[in-house]
Every structure is written in structure tokens, then in C-alpha cells.
Amino acid sequence: MKKISLLIVSLFLFPSISYSNFYDGIWEVTDVVGESWFSLKKRHIGKTQEYWKGYAGGVFFTCNYKGLVTTRDSYTIDEFLNKEEFRLFSKHKDELDMEGTEVSVTRKTCTGNYLASRKEMYPIVNFENWDKAFYLSKGVIFVMEQDWSSD
């Protein structure tokens, strides 16, 4: 009985940790928004990022079945746009298709075999349209769309 109680308490304490992946599939980079160079757009548009049952591979992040962990935080659109770490989204909100009132911010971490091999892809942002994701990196926002043709 103690084990069941501990399990239930753990589920409430750590609700945002997930080993499953609703991002499963192939995501294609369709745009680059922000302070980017032309070559950055040229290098990334059309490239893909894939997630599949513990595997991640692509233009931004690779984790070869070695501890891919997903965590998420939820915000209202106002909370999200007012957070300092997401100020670039606020600056470019007219260029981005930010529909809805709820925002999901996801962190993908690959623990690897050693601490030195730990990698992270953060933040991956969705605005109620789960077919589109935004990845903020190095002062630019990469727009990714789910490639349903790969299913």
C-alpha cells in the first residue's frame, strides 16, 4: 500500500516529466524569424528534426536512444510574452502565427551515457496549434511544422 501511495504522490509532484513524446514524427524548418543572417535561413529551411520513441535526430539535436527526457511548462499567452527569456517572441509576435491563449514550453534533454555528453533542446514552444512549433536559439526563432507525409 505504501508503494501505491508513493506512486500517486509522485505523479502529483512531477506532473510535467514525460518519457513519452507527442512530438513523435518529423518536423520541417519552414522559416527563420529574428536577427538572422541570410545564410542562416538558407542553411536551415527545409531541414528536419525527428523524434521517435526515445530517438531524436536532425538539424538541431541528436539523441540516439540514450535517455531522451521531455519536460513541459504551461503559460497563458500574456505570462509567456512577459517572461524575460521569451522576449524575442514578444518582439516578433506580428511575424509569428501565435494563435490561442495557452502556451506550452518544452525541454528535450538527452542524458547520454556520461554527464559530459548531456545535450538539451530548449525552448520548443507551441501555441495551441500543435502542428507548428517554434525553437528559440542564438537570437532567432526557427519555425517548424509537422511533416504528416512521413506517417
State where each predicted segment sits.
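Sec-dependent N-terminal signal peptides
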Residues: I4-P15
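Sec/Tat signal peptide C-region and signal peptidase I cleavage site
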Residues: S16-S20
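A mature extracytoplasmic/lumenal domain signature
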Residues: D31, G67-V69, W148
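Beta-sheet ligand-binding and adhesion/scaffold domains
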Residues: F80-D151
